[in-house]
Regions:
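Intrinsically disordered, low-complexity coil segments
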Residues: 24, 31, 59, 145-148
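Histidine-rich, glycine-flanked metal-binding segment
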Residues: 2-39
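N-terminal-biased segments
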Residues: 18-19, 38-53, 161-164, 168-169, ...
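Polyanionic/metal-chelating signatures
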Residues: 86, 91-183
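Solvent-exposed, acidic/flexible segments
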Residues: 2-3, 80-83, 154
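Glycine-rich loops and low-complexity Gly/Arg-rich segments
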Residues: 15-17, 35, 55-57, 67-69, ...
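Metal-associated gating/positioning segment near the N- to mid-region
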Residues: 33-102, 106-107, 113
């Protein structure tokens, strides 16, 4: 809804309150935004920021690990370069948060993490692990065909993903049983 005359209260960098009229307390740091459009920051839910390396050359590219098509053990934080210039670009474009991680080379590629873009270090930026990357498209098929390795078809790609998910399910069952108290 549009608020013609109103205010937005920001506390600790987050929107704490939105209201009509004037706020109860006016501060020196208040900004008069009359006639302006006010929006919260954007969230980019699919990026490889921090893995491609803004100007870092081949050494700065950690987006794909091509040694095995199934790599669920890859952790995004281990390859992420938080000093990548794309984070500063994101901040200047009002992108406040991103989900970033490995590329689409592998059918099972590793985890994805959510980050705040305006932070001084990775520990401060890290919101948490939010998922795992799966790729069913042409990228794994063409890469592994070129290497004369599996998967070379979408069928084989899907089969590898199913196998990895089944292994994960069995692992969960085993660990849940191990946590059950003995009688």
């Amino acid at each position: 809804d549009e608020i013609g005359c109103g205010y937005v209260l920001v506390e600790n960098g987050k929107i704490a309150e939105v209201g009509k009229g004037m706020p109860q307390h006016v501060r020196k740091s208040d900004i008069d935004a009359e006639g302006k459009l006010l929006m919260p920051g954007f969230i980019d839910i699919h990026t490889h920021m921090g893995f491609i390396g803004d100007g870092a050359g081949e050494e700065g590219i950690d987006v794909n690990e091509g040694s095995d098509p199934v790599m669920p053990q890859l952790r995004a934080v281990d390859g992420l370069n938080f000093m990548d210039g794309y984070f500063a670009d994101a901040v200047s474009a009002v992108v406040t948060s991103v989900v970033t991680g490995v590329g689409s080379l592998n059918p099972v590629g590793g985890d994805m993490v959510a980050l705040k873009t305006a932070a001084r270090c990775l520990d401060e930026a890290l919101i948490g692990t939010v998922g795992i990357k799966f790729a069913l498209g042409e990228t794994p098929k063409s890469y592994y065909t070129e290497r004369d390795d599996a998967p070379q078809t979408r069928m084989a790609t899907a089969a590898l993903i199913r196998e990895a998910l089944e292994k994960a399910r069995r692992y969960m069952v085993i660990t849940e049983r191990a946590e059950e108290p003995e009688d």
